[in-house]
Amino acid sequence: MDSLAAPQDRLVEQLLSPRTQAQRRLKDIDKQYVGFATLPNQVHRKSVKKGFDFTLMVAGESGLGKSTLVHSLFLTDLYKDRKLLSAEERISQTVEILKHTVDIEEKGVKLKLTIVDTPGFGDAVDNTECWKPITDYVDQQFEQYFRDESGLNRKNIQDNRVHCCLYFISPFGHGLRPVDVGFMKALHEKVNIVPLIAKADCLVPSEIRKLKERIREEIDKFGIHVYQFPECDSDEDEDFKQQDRELKESAPFAVIGSNTVVEAKGQRVRGRLYPWGIVEVENQAHCDFVKLRNMLIRTHMHDLKDVTCDVHYENYRAHCIQQMTSKLTQDSRMESPIPILPLPTPDAETEKLIRMKDEELRRMQEMLQRMKQQMQDQ
């Protein structure tokens, strides 16, 4: 029996040996493993738990399908209570700023989407500086964020800055109109502008190509800075690089929106039914809607937010700090012409409050001086 048991024990030992060796190798690897490679997962979990926010502005004259396109992009109706105005009412109304906010969740990821609409833009007989309320709104959001960022409670700052502006260009012209040029030049240093050719189903493919070329030429001619797609990293796969090339070649995007589901080749798709056929919203042979959606939501949403924060907001912030520094310098050089009267002796509590305020003012002045020095060094 012992002679039979010995081969069995050796066989079990041989079978267990690879597993034991693998466990030993894992233990050795575990000893060398620090753990910071899990940082991306930690950031991902924290970001998903917190959720994301994105503010999108839509601008352009009435009747170009702005509301329909927003509904098609996010599959959410933000204009349920909208009142349609007559032609006379549209002409007489002034430019308004309307915000629509909705919380969207997809596969556990939460997005707080804010759509900033601009009804009345470009509808008047005289459209001189009709973009002024819009530029004022963008500046107000920068100012509010700057105040919140400079305050004491910076933990839960609400970001209402405009991250992207979809500007709708009429397909019925021969390029950019003066109001288009004026709007984009007024906002191109404040927000990421993505120009769109609206209602692309009104044009044949050759007309769309000519209009795109004309708009690109005029954007360069007038020195308009639209949103620039970032360059691909060298380690990106070929499919992503090809997609990036197609995006850059397709700008400005010619888009179609539709909330209607139609039957096409045995499938139900969103599109428009005409006597001569069906235009499918998500058919890339018909329009650039899919490219716009991929760019705006799936590939470049975070970059739009980064450019807003690192470029447009930083320019505004630097301008504010320069103004504050200049004002402090002027105030320090001025001598008051009014004689200072002796004040009554303050009590202990008032004296303590004054000391705290003086200390706070001194810290702010030192901070501004350091910022000024850093800006001069740069």
Swiss-Prot record:
GO MF entries: GTP binding
UniProt-listed GO biological process terms: adult behavior; cell division; regulation of exocytosis; social behavior
Post-translational modification remark: Phosphorylated by DYRK1A.
Broad class of where this protein is predominantly found: cytoplasm
Keyword vocabulary terms for this entry: Cell cycle, Cell division, Coiled coil, Cytoplasm, Cytoskeleton, GTP-binding, Methylation, Nucleotide-binding, Phosphoprotein
GO cellular component terms, semicolon-separated: plasma membrane; presynapse; septin complex; synaptic vesicle
Residues where Phosphoserine is found: 234, 336
Binding annotation for GTP: 60-67, 94, 120, 199-207, 257, 272
One Pfam family of this chain: Septin
Region (G1 motif): 60-67
Region (G3 motif): 117-120
CDD domains on file: CDC_Septin
Signal peptide segment: none
Regions annotated as coiled coil: 347-378
Residue ranges of the region described as G4 motif: 198-201
Positions carrying Phosphothreonine: 345
Ranges for domain Septin-type G: 50-323
Modification type Omega-N-methylarginine: residues: 177
Subcellular location: Cytoplasm; Cytoplasm, Cytoskeleton
Domain of life: Eukaryota
Quaternary context: Septins polymerize into heterooligomeric protein complexes that form filaments, and can associate with cellular membranes, actin filaments and microtubules. GTPase activity is required for filament formation. Interacts with SEPTIN2 and SEPTIN5. In platelets, associated with a complex containing STX4. Interacts with PRKN; this interaction leads to SEPTIN5 ubiquitination and degradation. Interacts with DYRK1A. Interacts with STX1A; in the cerebellar cortex.
Role description: Filament-forming cytoskeletal GTPase. May play a role in cytokinesis (Potential). May play a role in platelet secretion.
Family: Belongs to the TRAFAC class TrmE-Era-EngA-EngB-Septin-like GTPase superfamily. Septin GTPase family.
Protein name: Septin-5
Organism of derivation: Macaca fascicularis
